Amino acid sequence: MNVLRDTAKPAREHFDDVEAAQVTEGLAESAFAMRQDWDGKPWNPPAREQPGVYAWGEAHLQYAYSLQFEATGNRRYLDVLVSRFRQLLALRDDRSGRLDEVRGRVMPAWGSVRFSTRPPFEGKSTCWAVHAGMILYPAARFVRMVQADPAICRRYAGPVAEFRQAIMETLAAYEENWHENVPQSGGDTEGYYTEPMAGPDPLPLNQMNTLGRVMLELAVADGDIQYRKRVENLARFTKRRMHVNGRNALEWDYRPGLSPPFDS
C-alpha cells in the first residue's frame, strides 16, 4: 500500500493511513512489518521470547506516536503509546526471570539471542545497551512531554510515575558498564559505555548515545543533575572524536577509540 503517493496530505495524516491499514494490537517485530523480521522471516525464537528485537520495530512505532502527539496535540496517540509500552514492560526480562547469559544475572531490560553471533557468546541471550536505549526513548519522551503540559499532567500522572521508575531501573542496570576518562591532552571528563559482548572498548557512538538521549529526556523533565552530567560526558566523548574532512564537513568514526588519532 503506497500511502505516500498523495503528496498533498500532511505527514501526520499519512501516519493515520498507515496505522489504520497495518498497525495491530500486537507489537511491531521489525521496522518493515508487524510480524516477522526485516528479511520477512519468523523470528527464531519468537520475538516475545527475545524482546530485545523490538528495539528495531516497536520502538520506532512508539516514537512515531510521540511525534504524532507533538504534531497534533491529540491525546489518543499518548493513550496508544501508554498501552503499547506497558506491553513491552511486561516482557522485560526481570518480569519473567529470564537470565542474561553473558552478564550472569537477570536484567531489568530486554534480552535477545539474534545478535549473539560471535564465540564464546554465540547464541547466548543478553541485554544490549542499545536495545534498552531504543526501547526506553519513546517512554522517556512521554514523561518529558506530559510533565511540560499542565493540561494533561494530572491525566497521565500514573503512567508518568510508572514509566519513570521503569526507565530508572533499566538505566541503573547498565551502571557497571559506564566509564569516565580524562583525556591525555587535558580538559573536562568524558564518558562512555561498554558492552560485555563487545569487549572493553567503547561502544559505537550511536549505541551508547541511545542511553544518553533517554537520560537527556529525564534531565529536561525532572532537572536531574546526575543524568545531565552523564549526557554532558557522553557529548564530550562524541565531540572530541569529530574532525573536519576535506569537504569542510564534520566526520567521525563509527566506533572510535579512547586515544587519537580519531580520523582513521
Regions found by a protein language model. Give the residues of each.
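Low-complexity, Ser/Thr/Pro/Gly-enriched N-terminal "stalk/linker" regions
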Residues: M1-E122, Q165-Y192, F237, R241-P256
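Eukaryote-skewed repeat-based solenoidal scaffolds used as protein-protein interaction platforms
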Residues: A139-E251, L258, F262
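Aromatic- and histidine-enriched alpha-helix N-cap/loop-to-helix transition segments
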Residues: E49-A64, R76, S83, T126-P138, ...
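Conserved aromatic-histidine-acidic binding/catalytic patches
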Residues: E49-V53, F69, G73-R76, G123-C127, ...
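Substrate-binding cleft of extracellular glycoside hydrolase catalytic domains
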Residues: R98-A132, F142-P159
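Well-ordered alpha-helical scaffold segments within catalytic/enzyme domains
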Residues: M1-D17, A59-R75, M134-Y156, T210-I225
